[in-house]
Amino acid sequence: MTTSILYGRPPLVFDPPGAATQTSPLIPGSTALESLADGSVETAMVYAPPGVLERRYALAQALRALQVGGRLDVMAAKDKGGSRLKKELEAFGLEVGETAKAHHRRCLVIKTGSETGLDAAIAAGAMQAVEGLEAWSQPGVFAWDRIDAGSAQLAAHMPALKGAGADLGCGYGALATVVLRSEAVTSLRLIDLDRRAVDAARKNVEDARASFEWADVRTLEAAGDLDFIVSNPPFHDGGSEDRRLGQAFIKKAAEMLKKGGGLWLVGNRHLPYEADLNAAFKRVTPAGDGGGYKLFEATK
Ligand SMILES: C[S@@+](CC[C@H](N)C(=O)[O-])C[C@H]1O[C@@H](n2cnc3c(N)ncnc32)[C@H](O)[C@@H]1O
């Protein structure tokens, strides 16, 4: 029996339990909330994610897994869903104790067994075939119910690629699907930090040349054996953390490629990737510019 679970990494002021089972899909190797049996958990701490569907899904899953009388302790930054937490939990029929701390709202509830609406929240936030997208995806996954404009730009400008390659930050597999249209591609590693993205990609990309890895690109081992890499690296709102992520992707791509191998990269126009590309690659060619995005082909 799992006794204590944790979802995400709450700030230390909330005293996250050290020995709890981690259940965040964004932490490779963690246990999936979905895999926990009903009523098998004594206490749960959830650092609630910012998306509404994703958050209600995580809360409903945690409540489902809790035993009656078990405690759910949830917090979120005020402007990242925290101010809606209490209402959302009350909508499940729970009595909620709310406090404010460190720009967060924290809610404590005890499972009664009479909660309502858990199944509906789980269905709305689960992996699903997205209408109009013709793909499987899940709320919380990057651009989960649409084709990202940056990836679309890259897909439109890339030539047919050849040999062994990887898609760093593959999401639910939109770009990889286009890459695999080239018959000269012999293998493609789809890699993402988000388990939900990797699971969706596995369903979307049914191709014997594809393999799937739930991993952090920054800590991948690089063998320098790939012919090509495509990537629409994480950027979010262009904060400094995101910029560093993109820079780490570029460096890792250079390590993973063989000499002469090529990286096809799309970045938000405001992100200054040029210096990092020039430092890690022999030749960097702008490959298009439009719609707020810049494309690059970089050769090792
Ligand atoms: C801009 S999105 C591109 C997704 C996909 N190519 C698409 O077009 O839908 C970047 C992806 O990188 C993933 N990601 C973020 N940090 C990562 C990391 N450290 N290692 C691997 N993937 C990461 C995100 O989960 C997200 O799916």
Task: Give the residues covered by each predicted segment.
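Conserved SAM/SAH cofactor-binding pocket of Class I
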Residues: 1-29, 148-231, 237
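Short SAM/SAH-binding signature in class I
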Residues: 41-47, 226-234, 264
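N-terminal auxiliary segments of SAM/dcSAM-dependent transferases
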Residues: 52-130
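A short glycine-rich, Lys/Arg-flanked "PGG" loop and its adjoining helix->strand segment in the class I
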Residues: 57-68, 247-259
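Short beta->alpha hinge that forms the Motif I/post-I loop of the SAM-binding pocket
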Residues: 77, 192-195, 245, 268-269
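Conserved S-adenosyl-L-methionine
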Residues: 94-103, 136-138, 283-291
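SAM-dependent Rossmann-like transferase core, predominantly class I methyltransferases
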Residues: 101-162, 171
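Mobile active-site "lid"/loop adjacent to the S-adenosyl-L-methionine
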Residues: 229-255
